[in-house]
């Protein structure tokens, strides 16, 4: 007899920069959430949808849980904690190449309270000697009775299929919540903003990334079938604006070039990308600015 179709919501949690977005992109087999080596890249809770013949798994990609330093940080933590409500399972990600720290313990204590099966996913196994992985497993396994332990490399795909296989075992029969071809709940404008923000994170220095907000002001299809997109990058200081623009506009041109290529792949159309940089002092601590940029409480 054919097994019933299964579905469920799975929170992906961990401290900043353990590879949550990279893992989800690998599972979905398409880039849905932005990836950067800067911590706390993901700012909103994002639904990412995996559908196959047997199940539909809705992953909740969350901001890395951390001690907030401003209103934006508190919003990010709230988004991460809210993902732990009404879920069917959780993936607790840790990094194989880093020692267990207070941040990992803080996240684990939060996810334990959700009362659902929790899988320990040890990411970045490509960065360590394979002989060291059993010790990492033993270190975390003493802390909690995990539903399963899965060492993976989200970067190169090692063991990633095991994640979905293990989730299928514990999910209950349920409906398809989303169409087969839907992979995220994020609108195109937000995806465009996130692509630009990702390229900016990669192109700028350490002092800029977390002071940046990117907002897509306009998306209009022109007569020549080219999509005109106007994006505004907000920073907090004039010095940051100069860094983003670069000498003779070189940095901004680089950001625009790489972002345009990816946006054209997303939209399937030629794109004219118009990026502006503006200063909005201390926007991360201003509720009105956070709401304007889409960081709103649910």
Residue positions per predicted region:
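Conserved G1/Walker A P-loop phosphate-binding module
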Residues: 1-89, 94
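Conserved glycine(s) of the Walker
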Residues: 19, 159, 251
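Conserved, well-folded catalytic cores of nucleic-acid-processing
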Residues: 30, 49-53, 68, 83, ...
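Catalytic P-loop NTPase motifs of RecA-like helicase/translocase cores
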Residues: 42, 65-67, 99-100, 128-129, ...
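Conserved C-terminal guanine-recognition region of P-loop GTPase G domains, centered on the G4
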Residues: 50-56, 75-149, 203, 220-223
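Active-site glycine-centered loops adjacent to acidic/histidine catalytic or metal-binding residues
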Residues: 61, 123, 153
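Canonical P-loop GTPase G-domain recognition
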Residues: 117, 126-184, 188
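P-loop NTP-binding site
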Residues: 188-298
